């Protein structure tokens, strides 16, 4: 749009940086590789129900055609307690960049997600140079509880997903009394809780396939285009001086 287009009553906007939605950009050629999904879980316990739930999610995602990697948080330092060059930090960041979608699984402890879960997310930056490790990627959230069903952890993770500029899918899973939902071999028993996990993983793969090839377009923002144009104009002005 040009600035002299009087048919638009938007005096506060830079019309040169406004873009009408382009349906063709929302339907690019589809990638043929398997969806890449990263799973994070928030416990270091030997018998960890969030880890067991993460493994069930992995099996389902692989059935639905995804390539899945599960990050082991053992050895990950607390945020700011080690340099970003720490091997576990680098592993986590590289996996986040690799992924096209993520699953976050946390126990609920004292009405919140665990510190182990939060530490993993805190180590992932919003941007590293021109790379944004999570922006535009899909996210599914799940939690386990030792008592009655609760949604505090998944609600918190949804807020974090928004701050990380992710596309959090509508469905979610909260497994109550998790110690009753797994057998002696660590496999989840048939139940409505398991059915919900299936629903969530199926939905995540669908949303990932739907958005991964146009995520850059979906997150292309007017304010950032305006800022980039101003920076470019400033550089050109400096060169001409």
Curated annotation (Swiss-Prot):
GO molecular function, one term: oxidoreductase activity, acting on NAD(P)H, quinone or similar compound as acceptor
Transmembrane regions listed in the UniProt entry: none
Listed InterPro entries: Arsenate-R_ArsH, Flavoprotein-like_sf, FMN_Rdtase-like_dom
Binding-site residues for FMN, renumbered to this chain: 43-50
Domain of life: Bacteria
Gene Ontology terms describing biological process: protein homotetramerization; response to metal ion
Family: Belongs to the ArsH family.
Quaternary structure note: Homotetramer.
Record-linked NCBIfam families: resist_ArsH (TIGR02690)
PANTHER family in the cross-refs: ARSENIC RESISTANCE PROTEIN ARSH (AFU_ORTHOLOGUE AFUA_5G15030)
Protein name per the record: NADPH-dependent FMN reductase ArsH
